[in-house]
Amino acid sequence: MSTTYLQAVNDVLTRLREQTVTTVALTDYSQLIGKFVNDAKRQVENAFNWNALRQTISINTVAGTSNYTLTGAGQNFRVEDVFNTTSCVTMANLDGNTMYRYLNFGTLPQSSPTHYAFSGVSGGNAKVDIWPVPDGVYALKFNLFVPTADLSSDSYTLTVAEPVIIQLAYARGLVERGEDGGLSSSEAYALGRAMLSDFIAMEGTNFIENQLFVAV
């Protein structure tokens, strides 16, 4: 069963030899530890393309429209693949300057989209330009790794590498409090980094793409 936000905070408090709480918002200190848990969560989620963070954002194009919002993607995602499933095409990523020239210089061709480039933000979500401008309805699939939102409710759960997040939050707690004769903050951080490496290695064995080495 996944670890809740409250359980993670209490785990860190216990390691710091502090009193556990019934809600993260109970004391100023438990709220601070909650901040550290969220900081550690972001660090861990950004460290690897975790399977639990995979999402597919779907777009159905409109004829003559080249710009779309990836609702639910946020801004800190990582792209795995983008497909035009209607035309059975893997879409290629263009740099922003090239896409701007394609969309603004000369007569715009309208056909099945084959290229994309990210362009701006709307409502906290990334926007994307596609080219050629669609001449009808095409189903586009953006396969992304999307970090989870910050934990705020006691019942929210951690998604990836829970022991690592707790260990790194504990290390942050040690830095804030100062040394007290127990594990030093540098030792706690080193242990957290080693744990993170182990979790990444274990996750990587489940996916063949993480075991390929390509000469460059």
Residues of each region from the PLM?
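Glycine-enriched, solvent-exposed interface loops adjoining structured elements
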Residues: 1-216
